[in-house]
Swiss-Prot record:
Species per Swiss-Prot/TrEMBL record: Arabidopsis thaliana
Stated name of the protein: Aspartate aminotransferase, chloroplastic
One protein family per Pfam: Aminotran_1_2
EC category: transferase
Keyword Chloroplast annotated: yes
Family annotation (InterPro entries): Aminotransferase_I/II_large, Asp_trans, NHTrfase_class1_PyrdxlP-BS, PyrdxlP-dep_Trfase, PyrdxlP-dep_Trfase_major, PyrdxlP-dep_Trfase_small
Gene Ontology CC terms, in alphabetical order: amyloplast; chloroplast
Residues that coordinate or bind L-aspartate: 85, 181, 234, 427
UniProt record, GO biological process: 2-oxoglutarate metabolic process; aspartate metabolic process; biosynthetic process; glutamate metabolic process
Keyword annotations of the record: Aminotransferase, Amyloplast, Chloroplast, Plastid, Pyridoxal phosphate, Transferase, Transit peptide
PANTHER family: ASPARTATE AMINOTRANSFERASE, ASPARTATE AMINOTRANSFERASE, CYTOPLASMIC
Length: 453
């Protein structure tokens, strides 16, 4: 119980039950646990106990989502938010796909309820997402060899898989590209799954270090999980060629590793759902067992709906059934069951021939706008930079991100001087850039590259 000290104009105002001698606790200056409050002629000093949470330290801001908070606080009219990977229109406004609006209207017309989904999610969604990934007639689907359950977008789906690895592959290591998406390491750390890195980005060429990648995958302990970006590598935008994917599959098979794909941009990288799934389908055709996490944040713009899936391709239908049962067991205490709204949107869009065609057209439009902006940025850099630097790496990258090659100090200059908000590894999201601001961004990049070391 907190102690009190009352200072009154007349001691006769003290309550009878309070002993005046017991009130001599000192002042707030001499006792750090006392706080003084004044009420007219009465001063009350309260002893406050230390918080039980004193040992909890302040967490650092998220390196990606924290960029948006800093951007919002900036009042400069030329500011650009190129940090978070979210699609914007040419006017730099959020975009809700027309086909998503149609799917939502359909749900309203039908009067869909808000009842709980099963632990594994919406059956129509799970069927649709597996078919989008592998193709409707693929043997893994026909033979029921893929365990698919709905997850909380890409992050939640990765986390489910990480928990499965921790439980059933004790001591196994996940090997991650260097660099990779900022949340990958957090997810495996949280699941207590050890990880290491394989070489991926070559700063000298601002391209793929393919030889280093292959060498490191070969050196990984046999049976490691090799985390691969299915398309539009984040943060570099650098993807292996089809021939290089074949070599990657060869090495993973030779070493008895388990591939683990993160597919966050299917259809959003090239504009084609099938082309962006080619790497995953290559591994499936070889009869390999592997994981695939999916997200619909980018290709359907369902960022806030948290809609995705984890797929585990197995060698038999029996194994897939058992894997699915354990994924459900993991999900139950973690979040119980997934949200229905986004799952119904995906199921409606994929299940309707007209809406599916409209979705593909909108994806092509979004991917096309990013390609146009990428070309315009390159053209602006070439025309403005008289140093002779080769900027062609920008055109060789794919998807919504570009790895500029800028270091932390140069990235800081982009923000501090030019009000261009980006992650400190030099990644920019071209989805947040307009044609009108390409020249301004080119000026910022040229200044930061040449004048900041």
């Amino acid at each position: 119980m907190a102690s009190l000290m009352l200072s009154l104009g007349s001691t006769s105002l003290l309550p009878r039950e309070i002993n005046k001698d017991k009130l001599k606790l000192g002042t707030s200056a001499s006792n750090p646990f006392l706080k003084a409050k004044s009420f007219s002629r009465v001063t009350m000093t309260v002893a406050v106990k230390p918080s039980r949470f004193e040992g909890i330290t302040m967490a650092p801001p998220d390196p990606i989502l924290g960029v948006s908070e800093a951007f919002k606080a900036d009042t400069n009219g030329m500011k650009l938010n190129l940090g978070v990977g979210a699609y914007r229109t040419e006017e730099l406004q959020p975009y809700v796909l027309n086909v998503v609006k149609k799917a939502e209207n359909l749900m309203l017309e039908r009067g869909d309820n808000k009842e709980y989904l099963p632990i594994e999610g919406l059956a129509a969604f799970n069927k649709a997402t597996a078919e989008l990934l592998f193709g409707a007639g693929h043997p893994v689907i026909k033979e029921q060899r893929v365990a698919t359950i709905q997850g909380l977008s890409g992050t939640g789906s990765l986390r489910l898989a990480a928990a499965l690895i921790e439980r059933y592959f004790p001591g196994a290591k996940v090997v991650i590209s260097s660099p990779t998406w900022g949340n990958h390491k957090n997810i495996f750390n949280d699941a207590k799954v050890p990880w290491s890195e394989y070489r991926y980005y070559d700063p000298k060429t601002i391209g793929l270090d393919f030889e280093g990648m292959i060498a490191d995958i070969k050196e990984a302990p046999e049976g490691s999980f090799i985390l691969l970006h299915g398309c539009a590598h984040n943060p570099t935008g650098i993807d292996p060629t089809p021939e290089q994917w074949v070599k990657i599959a060869d090495v993973i098979q030779e070493k008895n590793h388990i591939p683990f794909f993160d597919v966050a941009y299917q259809g959003f990288a090239s504009g084609s759902l099938d082309e962006d799934a080619a790497s995953v389908r290559l591994f499936a055709e070889r009869g390999m067992e592997f994981f695939v996490a999916q997200s619909y944040s980018k290709n359907l713009g369902l960022y806030a709906e948290r809609i995705g899936a984890i797929n585990v391709v197995c060698s038999s239908a029996d194994a897939a059934t058992r894997v699915k049962s354990q994924l459900k067991r993991i999900a139950r205490p973690m979040y119980s069951n997934p949200p229905v709204h986004g799952a119904r949107i995906v199921a409606n869009v994929v299940g309707d021939v007209t809406m599916f065609s409209e979705w593909k057209a909108e994806m092509e439009m979004m991917a096309g706008r990013i390609k146009t902006v990428r070309q315009e940025l390159y053209d602006s850099l070439v025309s403005k930079d008289k140093s002779g630097k080769d900027w062609s790496f920008i055109l060789k990258q794919i998807g919504m991100f570009s790895f500029t090659g800028l270091n932390k100090a140069q990235s800081d200059n982009m923000t501090d001087k030019w009000h261009v908000y980006m992650t400190k590894d030099g990644r920019i999201s071209l989805a947040g850039l307009s044609l009108a601001k390409c020249e301004y961004l080119a000026d910022a990049i040229i200044d930061s590259y040449h004048n900041v070391s």
